[in-house]
Amino acid sequence: MKVKLICVGKLKERYLKDGISEYQKRLSRFCQFEMIELTDERTPDKASFADNQLIMSKEAQRIHKKIGERDFVIALAIEGKQFPSETFSELISGVTVKGYSTITFIIGGSLGLDSIIKKRANMLMSFGLLTLPHQLMRLVLTEQIYRAFMITKGSPYHK
């Protein structure tokens, strides 16, 4: 199984890179994990609605190029479904049973995701109504993916 994490923007903070790297190492026992960082568009101060739409559209084009035709896509969006960790674990296990070999998670840029990406997604997922920095969300999501595999394995990691 392959798990891809497509993110808009480059990760700069060392502590976040270190945390993600640790979970990538742990995930290597269960799957091939790949984090793809895409260039984000600069958002001008006082950008108009049309400017924001254009920016999200450009970012969506970059994202779309990295999604495989047969990928099961989960896009993170505030309006998405929320799951307890156990249900998330069942979801990941169930995707492979349905014949998908790649699960692709998408974290958009500071403006969010264009509707074309949300429509392509098999599922929209939310971590709640809190606003988190997109860079921190990468670490949180990577840990939850690892936790999902550990739950499936029956490990005491998830208590």
From Swiss-Prot:
An example molecular function term from Gene Ontology annotations: rRNA (pseudouridine-N3-)-methyltransferase activity
Q: Enumerate the UniProt keywords alphabetically.
A: Cytoplasm, Methyltransferase, rRNA processing, S-adenosyl-L-methionine, Transferase
Give the location in the cell: Cytoplasm
Q: Where does S-adenosyl-L-methionine bind?
A: L76, G108, F127, G128, L129, L130, T131, L132
The organism sits in which domain of life?
A: Bacteria
- EC number(s) from the headed UniProt entry: 2.1.1.177
On subunit structure and binding partners, the annotation says: Homodimer.
What does the similarity note say? Belongs to the RNA methyltransferase RlmH family.
UniProt-recorded name of the protein: Ribosomal RNA large subunit methyltransferase H
Q: Which gene encodes it?
A: rlmH
